[in-house]
Amino acid sequence: MSEATTTLDGWYCLHDLRSIDWAAWKTLSSDERGQAVSEFLNVVEKWNDVAAAKKGSHAMYTVVGQKADIMLMILRPTMEELNEIETELNKTTLAEYMVPAYSYVSVVELSNYLPADEDPYQNPQILARLYPELPKANHICFYPMDKRRQGDDNWYMLPMEERKKMMYSHSKIGRQYAGKVRQVISGSVGFDDFEWGVTLFADDILQFKKLIYEMRFDEVSARYGEFGTFFVGNILPDEKVEKFLHI
């Protein structure tokens, strides 16, 4: 039996993607739509207060393509808080004109390869990655993924040292994009349909394509990677929500 990798776990994460029922939204009067937008922004302001207190973080993006219209990424210390946020949002008037498109539940995760005598939760760099302040980058790319476990290509049957070696090589590619792409990895084994969620942030959207394409040639992806649906979008600042929903 292969040895399991020890992971470090941070904030719980919810990716909530919704489509707008524009036809139904149009039936409201201008005043009714305005009230619905104000109510939604009041909820977002609560999230801003939490972020300011460094007790969580969030990101809001519009989605390009027909898969969804809006993507919310929420980070919180407990799964209960994610549930409360989702429920509060569902009770708003705006939610009556939203159609659930996709969701993903996970927890921010790092593999722990530090020496046994070092407490990773005392390392400021690790804490910043486990409890991140999500960047206000122009663009987002999110996708879930698995490690293949079929026949001879079974990631989970490989020895620990071999997995470490391959992941080190894999991570070297990612480090070449430092300053261009910010990455948040979240684990979802037992939480959702895939094993990990990968969220990328960048001001130059082409960096997503370059990074992911280059990684395709690395053995970790080429031989062992299996990927779900990709979602890509543009940042939606609070002050532009009203314009986005304007009819």
From Swiss-Prot:
A GO BP entry is: heme B biosynthetic process
InterPro entries, sorted:
CHDC (IPR031332), ChdC/CLD (IPR010644), Dimeric_a/b-barrel (IPR011008)
Q: From the UniProt record, which GO molecular function terms apply?
A: heme binding; metal ion binding; oxidoreductase activity, acting on the CH-CH group of donors, oxygen as acceptor; peroxidase activity
Annotated binding of Fe-coproporphyrin III, by residue = R129, Y143, P144, M145, D146, K147, H170, Q183, S221
Q: Please state the pathway this protein functions in, per its UniProt record.
A: Porphyrin-containing compound metabolism; protoheme biosynthesis
Q: Which Pfam families match?
A: Chlor_dismutase (PF06778)
PANTHER family, alphabetically? COPROHEME DECARBOXYLASE, HEME-DEPENDENT PEROXIDASE YWFI-RELATED
Q: What class of enzyme is it?
A: oxidoreductase
What cofactors does the UniProt entry give for this protein?
Fe-coproporphyrin III
Q: What is this protein called?
A: Coproheme decarboxylase
What NCBIfam families does UniProt report for this protein, alphabetically?
PRK12276.1
Q: What does this protein do?
A: Involved in coproporphyrin-dependent heme b biosynthesis. Catalyzes the decarboxylation of Fe-coproporphyrin III (coproheme) to heme b (protoheme IX), the last step of the pathway. The reaction occurs in a stepwise manner with a three-propionate intermediate.
User: Keywords in UniProt for this one?
Assistant: Heme, Heme biosynthesis, Iron, Metal-binding, Oxidoreductase
Give the reaction(s) catalysed.
Answer: Fe-coproporphyrin III + 2 H2O2 + 2 H(+) = heme b + 2 CO2 + 4 H2O; Fe-coproporphyrin III + H2O2 + H(+) = harderoheme III + CO2 + 2 H2O; harderoheme III + H2O2 + H(+) = heme b + CO2 + 2 H2O
Q: How is the cofactor bound?
A: Fe-coproporphyrin III acts both as a substrate and a redox cofactor.
Question: What gene does the UniProt entry assign to this protein?
Answer: chdC
- EC assignment: the record states 1.3.98.5
Protein family: Belongs to the ChdC family. Type 1 subfamily.
Source organism per UniProt: Bacillus cereus (strain AH820)
**Catalytic residues per the record?**
Y143
